[in-house]
Swiss-Prot record:
GO process terms (BP): pseudouridine synthesis; rRNA processing
Recorded name of the encoding gene: nop10
Coiled-coil stretches noted in the UniProt entry, renumbered to this chain: none
Ribonucleoprotein listed as a keyword: yes
One Pfam family per UniProt: Nop10p
Organism: Methanopyrus kandleri (strain AV19 / DSM 6324 / JCM 9639 / NBRC 100938)
Protein name as annotated: Ribosome biogenesis protein Nop10
Amino acid sequence: MPKRLRRCKECGEYTLQRDKCPHCGGDLEVPHPHRFSPEDPYGKYRRKLKKRVWAEKFGPPSGEGD
């Protein structure tokens, strides 16, 4: 099983350990991006969520709702 490099959320150090940072004891995260899929089965939902968040933060986009 290949090991993945992990980064500490607290101090930013990189490690191969899986549970806690050996330097500060903080939580670890995988710093790699998610895999890309051309089919993108959840793209429709992600775009809908982005549109709703944008509308709540800045109002509806120009040209919509007029």
